[in-house]
Amino acid sequence: MGEKKFKHVMIDTETLGRTPGSVVRSVAAVEFDPQTGETGRKKVWKIDLADSIRYGFKVESSTLKWWMMQSEEARRDFVEGAETPLVDFLDDLDDFLSCVNEENDFTLWCLQLDFDVPMLRSYYAWYNLNAHGCDEEVLPWNFRKVRDVRPYMDALDSAGLLPPKVTDRHTPLADCLAQINYVHLVEKNNLVVR
């Protein structure tokens, strides 16, 4: 029997700003099944900070201050560890997502539609223009199949089923796994999402 094929991927980013064009420091992507909560491949990248700044991505002082006020463990996770060059990260994420489905026929999830996806779009816009000389938007996901976890959290909260946050580490992998759990709990309990 072959490896299970997943049709859903959760992504999460940790950044040094709240607007597109800000530095994306780390990204996680996790395949999952909303019905069962089962996860598949997981991948985490820590993007080379110097690359991001050299290529014109910005650091917002308010976000930098916010990171300085987080726990020592969260700050350490944010700063330490092997870094992936920016172009290698974009190629790797593209490969990860194309392994889900080469025709982009999968659902991409994130916590807020106006945060993670626009942050990554700005990186892909830079990449398409500077690495490929292409000013068209070429993304490794289908923009029609991007979903937001926030309404699922609202449905859980309304039903009194929203689990307490179990960590304050602010790592993209921990956030992805928590967000997958929210989606699964909504499916498991047949809650209405608005």
Which residue stretches match the model-derived regions?
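Acidic active-site catalytic centers that drive phospho-/nucleotidyl reactions
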Residues: 12-14, 116, 148, 175
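Substrate-recognition/cap helix-loop segment adjacent to the acidic, metal-dependent catalytic center
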Residues: 114-140
